[in-house]
Amino acid sequence: MAKKSMINRDIKRTKLVEKYKVKRLELKKIIKSINVSDEERFQATIKLQALPRDASPTRQRNRCALTGRPHGFYRKFGLARTKLRERTMNGEAPGLSKASW
């Protein structure tokens, strides 16, 4: 089980990412546009840097929904490998079964 503080920190980051998502996209669009002057591009870059660091989506971490484990995470199920295996063995994961050949 991950520390509650780490799980809460990731939840806080997720909220910040959602809050600033539109603003970040607009600023990035200005920065990448070739029709914008250098001064406007520079101002957009400064505004982007002024946004909170945790508002960047790359600072988010995928975590298991049950344990908060950050490694061995399967996006399709939202679970870490250990919990996914437990669910599979109990028949709780739809479409999964232990391989045998």
Curated annotation (Swiss-Prot):
<dbReference type="InterPro" id="IPR023036">
    <property type="entry name" value="Ribosomal_uS14_bac/plastid"/>
</dbReference>
<keyword id="KW-0687">Ribonucleoprotein</keyword>
<dbReference type="GO" id="GO:0005737">
    <property type="term" value="C:cytoplasm"/>
</dbReference>
<dbReference type="Pfam" id="PF00253">
    <property type="entry name" value="Ribosomal_S14"/>
</dbReference>
<keyword id="KW-0699">rRNA-binding</keyword>
<dbReference type="GO" id="GO:0003735">
    <property type="term" value="F:structural constituent of ribosome"/>
</dbReference>
<keyword id="KW-0689">Ribosomal protein</keyword>
<comment type="subunit">
    <text>Part of the 30S ribosomal subunit. Contacts proteins S3 and S10.</text>
</comment>
<comment type="function">
    <text>Binds 16S rRNA, required for the assembly of 30S particles and may also be responsible for determining the conformation of the 16S rRNA at the A site.</text>
</comment>
<dbReference type="GO" id="GO:0006412">
    <property type="term" value="P:translation"/>
</dbReference>
<dbReference type="InterPro" id="IPR001209">
    <property type="entry name" value="Ribosomal_uS14"/>
</dbReference>
<comment type="similarity">
    <text>Belongs to the universal ribosomal protein uS14 family.</text>
</comment>
<dbReference type="GO" id="GO:0015935">
    <property type="term" value="C:small ribosomal subunit"/>
</dbReference>
<dbReference type="GO" id="GO:0019843">
    <property type="term" value="F:rRNA binding"/>
</dbReference>
<keyword id="KW-0694">RNA-binding</keyword>
<protein>
    <recommendedName>
        <fullName>Small ribosomal subunit protein uS14</fullName>
    </recommendedName>
</protein>
